Design a protein with these regions (language model features):
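A short acidic/basic microdomain associated with nuclease active sites
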Residues: 34-55
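Short, solvent-exposed loop/turn segments at secondary-structure boundaries
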Residues: 86-89, 128-129
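Metal-dependent nuclease catalytic regions and adjoining charged, substrate-binding loops involved
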Residues: 49, 53-55, 59, 67, ...
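Short flexible/disordered coil segments
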Residues: 2-3, 39-43, 172-179
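Short coil/turn segments at secondary-structure boundaries
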Residues: 52, 88-91
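Metal-dependent nuclease catalytic cores in nucleic-acid-processing enzymes
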Residues: 91-113
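Conserved catalytic cores of phosphodiester-cleaving nucleases, focusing on short active-site segments
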Residues: 58-86, 96-102
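N-terminal signal-anchor transmembrane alpha helix of single-pass membrane proteins
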Residues: 1-33
Length: 179
């Protein structure tokens, strides 16, 4: 009987320590506490569906959505271990995250205070979902629509690695990726 009590007490203490460590880690990294209610990660139990917005004319699947007291926070996980210096976010990652903010706000009718981009080195970067960024998102969406009507779009970078990861590299006559 004493062994069972000691074992139970040890397990309760261990659980409390793990919970404390998890909360401390979340606070340290900038990940908000809240309920993860949507995941588009391989092998995860929560179902992720494509979010669509006819108002914005976009669709997508964020990696994760966290319900917090302030609203829903879209989270995007990136493989890159080297985010921009001084707390920045790459512009393409920022636009993607802003699009997820707009999708959640429009389709789910939920408040979205900000989004997060988490780089592989576990560096969490916050993307403010404010009026300035909404206007930028609207402008980028309009530019993409125009570009999609053009017979040819010119590559806008000199990065072979970016071409290697592109879904259109097989059809692209400007690809820097080695075949």
């Amino acid at each position: 009987m004493i062994i069972v009590l000691v074992l139970a007490s040890t397990l309760v203490l261990l659980a409390a320590l793990l919970l404390f460590a998890a909360r401390r880690s979340r606070r340290k990294t900038g990940i908000p506490s809240g309920e993860i209610f949507y995941q588009d990660l391989v092998g995860q139990p929560l179902e992720a569906k494509v979010l669509r917005s006819s108002r914005w004319g976009i669709s997508g699947k964020p990696d994760c959505l966290i319900r917090t007291p302030d609203g829903v926070v879209p989270v995007e996980l990136k493989k890159s271990k080297r985010p921009p210096a001084r707390g920045g976010v790459y512009p393409n990652h920022m636009i993607q995250n802003l699009a997820y903010c707009a999708l959640v706000e429009d389709q789910m009718q939920m408040q979205v205070p900000y989004g997060l981009v988490i780089y592989a080195g576990e560096q969490v970067r916050r993307v403010e979902y404010n009026e300035v960024n909404r206007l930028w998102l609207r402008k980028v969406i309009a530019e993409v629509r125009v570009a999609r009507t053009l017979p040819r779009v010119t590559r806008n970078h000199q990065m072979p690695g970016r071409c290697s990861g592109c879904g259109l590299r097989q059809q692209c006559d400007q690809s820097l990726a080695k075949s």
